[in-house]
A protein has these predicted regions:
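Flexible loop/turn connectors
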Residues: 2-111
Length: 112
């Protein structure tokens, strides 16, 4: 995050691998004087529930991890309980963008 904040021009936003990395990036940026989302927007992945413990609400991609786990368990139990080989199964879950304050920026582009 330190390198990104030193770039000229700075990036408009940062997409982090997961929510814990995003919260760390956001805390660092704020500690360095950056305004979230005015100076840099930050989004994570996982939609972990931080309640009100964050200084700025974190936008996130909800991958529906619980549904993934439940589906994987159902498939695994089906395989274990069957004497007949099962064909491969494809399961597609649509991720959901959960918008919170860390990416809520006014429509106009900030000056640099």
């Amino acid at each position: 995050m330190a390198q990104l904040l030193r770039l000229k021009p700075q990036p408009d936003g940062v997409f982090c691998y997961n929510d814990p990395l995003a919260t760390g990036a956001m805390d660092y940026a704020i500690d360095q004087g950056a305004r979230i989302p005015e100076d840099v927007a930050i989004i994570g992945c996982g939609n972990l529930h931080y309640d009100d413990s964050l200084r700025v609400g974190l936008s996130s991609i909800d991958q529906h991890s619980r549904r993934i786990g439940e589906g994987a368990a159902r498939i695994a139990l089906g395989i274990l309980g069957s004497r007949v080989p099962r064909p491969p199964e494809t399961v597609i879950l649509q991720p959901e963008l959960v918008i919170r304050a860390s990416t809520r920026r006014k429509a106009h582009r900030r000056g640099r």
